[in-house]
A protein has these predicted regions:
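Conserved beta-strand termini and adjacent loop/short-helix elements that scaffold enzyme active sites
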Residues: 32, 52-54, 114, 149-152
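Internal alpha-helical scaffold of NAD(P)-dependent oxidoreductase catalytic cores
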Residues: 100-110, 125-159, 163-180
């Protein structure tokens, strides 16, 4: 399994860390260079991690694609990429619904929305998935507790509340450093 991440922010870092610490079998993980600091840090920390020259190289070389960019960036780049029907595409994009992702991807691939939270790096916490998907569930069950959502409207509640997790943990980290 070749895993490709388009976007390398805090959530990608947490997901990749969780994958590398799990029993998920993969041949390589290819990261976009979007955040050079994070992509280089992940490559240095774990084996089988590579940094792509561009996003299309990730799509060309991987059978699992993780879309981990902001909604604004997603609208600028996803429709330009040439995906394959055989790929599993997992979107972490908060406000882009499944219908819009399908339009942007332009092929009938296996597409899911997933809401990873920072504790995924420790293989803990809930991982909401929409729509229910056996292959995606079997992948993410190694990284936390999978919650299958049958109604996309309900996932908006998860997106809204989970958006506060990263700032909350950042605040705790800052406070902890200050106390030391």
């Amino acid at each position: 399994m070749k895993l490709g991440f388009i976007g390398t922010g805090k959530i990608t870092s947490a997901v990749v860390t969780g994958i590398c610490k799990s029993k998920i079998k993969y041949t390589k993980i290819i990261l976009s260079e979007r955040n050079k600091k994070i992509s280089k840090q992940l490559k240095k920390s774990f084996k089988k991690i590579y940094i792509a020259k561009n996003n299309q190289d990730i799509v060309n070389d991987c059978n699992w694609i993780f879309l981990a960019v902001t909604p604004t960036v997603a609208n600028q780049i996803i429709h330009k990429l040439k995906f394959k029907k055989s790929q599993v595409i997992v979107s972490f994009i908060s406000t882009m619904n499944l219908q819009n992702i399908k339009k942007a991807v332009k092929v009938k691939a296996n597409i899911s929305r997933v809401i990873p939270l920072p504790p995924i790096s420790f293989k803990k916490g809930p991982i909401p998935i929409f729509p229910p998907n056996r292959k995606v569930k079997n992948f993410f069950k190694h990284l936390g507790t999978v919650v299958e959502i049958k109604n996309e409207k309900l996932s908006k509640n998860f997106w809204s509340t989970s958006g506060m997790m990263a700032p909350f943990y950042e605040l705790l980290r800052t406070m902890s450093e200050w106390l030391n």
